[in-house]
Amino acid sequence: MELLLNPSLFSLLPLLLFIIFLFKRLYTSPTCQRKLPPSPPKLPVIGNLHQVGSLPHRSLRSLSQKYGPLMLLHFGSVPVLVASSAEAACEIMKSHDIVFSTRPKSNISDKLTYGSKDIAFSPYGEYWRRVRSICVNHLLSNQRVKSFRHVIEEETKKMIENINERCVSSSSPVNLSDFTLTLTNSIICTIAFGRKHCDVENMRKIKAMLMGFEEILSVFDAGDYIPWLAWVNRFTGLDAKLKTLAKQGDELVEGVIDAHMKRKKAEAQSYDAADQAKGTDFMDILLDIYQGTVPGFALDRDSVKAIILDMFTAGTDTIYTSIDWTIAELLRHPRVLKKLHTEVRQVAQGKSEITEEDLGKMEYLKVVIKETLRLHPPIPLLLPRESTQEISIMGYHILAGTQVIVNAWAIGRDPLYWENPEEFRPERFMGSDMDFRGFNFEYTPFGAGRRSCPALAFAIAVVELTIAKLVQRFDFALPDEAKPEDLDMTEASGTTVHKQLPIVVNVVATRN
C-alpha cells in the first residue's frame, strides 16, 4: 500500500502514458483509425470469395441488403468496394469519376488483348484516352453509325428471310436465339472486317473464338486475387487455354489485316472524307491510323488487333443478350407483346421494310427495350474499376488500389427508385426523359462517366430494328401450349449474363 502511494511513482505516470501513446501510434495502422465501409466476416486467404456464388450480381445484392449500399469485401488479398445504390454509383461514376477511371490488372485480359491494349480493359491514362477518342470520333460517331445503317438493314432482312424459309420447310418450333446470334455476329463481322471476310468459314471461326472468349472471361483467375496461387493456372489448364485462345484470335485478325493491307496497297487508297461516305469498315479505319495517314492519331499493330477483338467480344455479347431478353420478356407478357404488335404494324402499315423514321415514331418499342435493360442489363456488374488514390465516399475511407464494382442489376431492381421493381412494366418509362446515356444513376445498363460503353448508340440501333422487324413480320407462341409464366428465365453465369436456355417458339408469318 505504501509502495502504491509513493510520490516518485506518480511522477513517472506521464512518461508511462506517453510511451503507451507512442506504441499505439507506431503499431496501429492509420486505416484502423478511419471509418471503413461495413464488411461481412471473411475467411483466411480467400476473404469473401466463398460468398460470391455463380450469379455474383444476385449474391452481392443479398449481402448489400444486410451490410448496406456501399460495402467492403475482400477477394483474396484484394479489397473490393461494392456499390448497390444510385447514390453510391453517382459518387463513383460522376463525383469522383477521375479517381475510379482505371481498371485493375487482369491476367486474362492481358493475355487476350496484347497487354490490355483494347478499350474495355486498358488502364486509364494517355493511351486509353487516345484509343477512346479513336473509337468515339472514327469508329462509332453518329455519322459512322448512320453509314452502317444499310448493313443492319441488310442483315436483319436476311434473318427475316431465313426464318420465313424455316417456317415454310418445317412446322416444328424455331430456335429464335440461334437466328439472333447469327444476325449479331454477321453485323459485327461486316462492319469490322467487310462483307467479303464474312464467309461461312470465317463466321465459323469467329463464333468458336467468341464462345471461347466468353467462357474464359468468366473464369476466376486465382493469381489476380491471391498472387502466390498464380501457379495453379498451369495445373487447372487456364494458362494453356489462354495461350490457345490468344493464338486463335491473333491468327484470325492477322489474316484479315494482311488481306486489307494487300487490297489497300493495290488500290492505293488514302483516308479522306470520301472513304467515310462509302462506309469503310473498322479495319480500314484502324489501318489508316496505323499507317500514319490520319493526323493526330497513332496506333501500333497490336493495338489494332486488340480494338477489333474488343468490338467482337463486347459488341456481339451485349447486342445478342439484349435482343434475347427482350423477346423473352415479350413472350412472358402477352399484353405488352400485343400492344407492341399494334404500334409497329400501324407505323409500318403497308411497308415491307421499317425505316429509321418509322423507328422514331415507335415510342412503345423504345420503352419496352428500356424496361428490359432495367431488369436485364447485359453486364449486371459493370466492369471493375480501381481507385487511384485514397478518398472518402459517403463518409467512408477508401484506400488506393481498391477494386470497385457497381451492381447495375441491383440498382435497377431497387424499390427505393422503382415501384414494383420485379414487375415488367414498360409504361413506367412513358413520358420520362430517362435514357441509356448514364445521366440517371438509378438506371445505368451501359455504365456512366468516362468508362461508359462507347458503342451504346450502335447497340440500341441494332436492338430496335431487330425487335421491330420480328414483331412486324411474325406472330409468336410458346410450343406445346405452354403458358407465358412457364417460360424459363434462368440466368447463365458469366460476365455477360445470358438467358440459360435458348428461346424456342412457334412462328407464324403475318400477312403484310
Swiss-Prot record:
Question: Required co-factor?
Answer: heme
By sequence similarity, the record places it as follows: Belongs to the cytochrome P450 family.
Cellular compartments annotated = Membrane
Name-wise, this protein is Norfluorocurarine oxidase
Q: What is its EC number?
A: 1.14.14.188
Q: Which Gene3D superfamilies match?
A: Cytochrome P450
Record pathway: Alkaloid biosynthesis
Family annotation (Pfam families): p450
Membrane topology field: Single-pass membrane protein
Q: Which PANTHER family match?
A: CYTOCHROME P450 71A2-LIKE, CYTOCHROME P450 FAMILY 71 PROTEIN
Give the binding site residues for heme: 453
Q: Name one GO molecular function term.
A: oxidoreductase activity, acting on paired donors, with incorporation or reduction of molecular oxygen
Listed GO biological process terms: alkaloid biosynthetic process
Which SUPFAM superfamilies is this protein grouped with? Cytochrome P450
Q: Which keywords does UniProt give here?
A: Heme, Iron, Membrane, Metal-binding, Monooxygenase, Oxidoreductase, Transmembrane, Transmembrane helix
Cellular component (GO) terms are: membrane
The UniProt transmembrane annotation reads 3-23
